[in-house]
Amino acid sequence: WCPAAVATEDRPAARAPARAVEGPVASIAVADHVFRAPKGTRDILWPDSSRWRSLVDVFADVVSSAGYLEVIPPMFEHVEVFQRLGQATDVVRKEMYSFEDRGGRNIALRPEQTASVVRAFAEHRPAVPWKAWYAGPNFRYERAQKGRFRQFDQVGVEVLGPEDAHVDAEVIALAWQFYERLGLRQVTLAVNSLGSAGDRARYVDALRAHFSADLGALSE
């Protein structure tokens, strides 16, 4: 569950002229784009930075009262950690920032944190139920536009171990409490179900069959 995200508007892609920059050693020619945040990112300055920190503090207070403990996963993982999300997902196929490091390992910046939390659970084997919360930036190479950005911050919770519908209800209730604490009043809560793993697999197959004849006419 990730109830909040922060990011920025698109940046102009036009090539800017170079200019001289005076430094302590020598003058160097640096293109203007060097002095702008990369496309799909931004600098979060005060007072926005203070508002974001306050939002995280409220979230931490709400979920900690229900027994959730903070986990801080690394910002990059072995790419296989995220490939387990599913090869058919846009995140895996088109949106991951992945690279080979100097040791020859395939690494990816995290596009979300659920997979990292599950990996941490498998590695450290904490007592169950393990109730974890997190906050921090994620990275996706997607088309930068208003409301969707290449670096964005999230807060969220995961519960690992039990298969209990009460856990689902608890997480939904925590989301509601969080929005209330933020002073949001016009919030509508809609609850649905994605079905079982078998249901989802059949649904994906049906969608592929339905759209396969028109693939050339579909946008990415």
PLM region spans:
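Cysteine-centered metal-binding/redox modules
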Residues: 4
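TRNA-recognition modules of translation machinery and tRNA-sensing kinases, especially anticodon-binding
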Residues: 7-220
